[in-house]
């Protein structure tokens, strides 16, 4: 785990802020991954829970997740733009007036954090990994994912899917029990 985190941090520093195209590519790969593995996902959820309806699982785990990933893909360009703000609204009136006369300008520049840790709960094991992943990738971050140990079949499939679609420098899945989760959250 620590080696993966070091690698992701190193590459974040070396490669700087990811482009719009790379962010959209990562989101596209998530969508393609869901489309390719949708039957296996539902089978694993059935194995883990034993009583999930395939239709409701398809709606909650696959379709709603594709919807949130598509939403992120459609809006990532807008979310990346710098946001202009009025200058010095918190300053006293004379200073605010002087600063505006001098032509000061303010903006918010959105930048990625680097590597984000994502610990998923057991109840919606695919949706609660990939829906937040949409905003994580849209923001330009890399991710380390710890799926729930209470859904072992789905966690193993999640690891397999991510190994196929992503390099560990972009997204890594760490499986294991409570001891792994404790070590993961302490990174």
What positions do the PLM features span?
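N-terminal Rossmann-like NAD(P)+-binding subdomain of aldehyde/semialdehyde dehydrogenases
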Residues: 1-105
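Rossmann-like NAD(P) dinucleotide-binding subdomain of oxidoreductase/dehydrogenase enzymes
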Residues: 81, 90-187
């Amino acid at each position: 785990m620590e080696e993966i985190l070091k690698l992701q941090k190193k590459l974040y520093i070396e490669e700087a802020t990811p482009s719009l195209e790379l962010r959209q590519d990562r989101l596209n790969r998530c969508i393609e991954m869901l489309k390719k593995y949708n039957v296996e996902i539902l089978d694993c959820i059935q194995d883990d829970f034993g009583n999930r309806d395939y239709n409701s699982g398809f709606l909650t785990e696959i379709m709603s997740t594709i919807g949130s990933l598509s939403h992120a893909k459609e809006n990532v360009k807008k979310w990346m733009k710098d946001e202009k703000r009025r200058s010095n609204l918190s300053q006293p009136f004379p200073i605010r007036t002087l600063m505006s006369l001098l032509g000061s300008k303010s903006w918010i520049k959105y930048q990625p954090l680097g590597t984000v840790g994502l610990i998923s709960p057991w109840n919606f094991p695919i949706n609660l990994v990939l829906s937040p992943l949409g905003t994580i990738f849209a923001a330009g971050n890399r991710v380390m994912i710890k799926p729930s140990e209470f859904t072992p079949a789905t966690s193993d499939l999640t690891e397999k899917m991510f190994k196929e679609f992503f390099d560990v420098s972009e997204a890594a899945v760490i499986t294991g029990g409570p001891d792994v989760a404790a070590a993961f959250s302490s990174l």
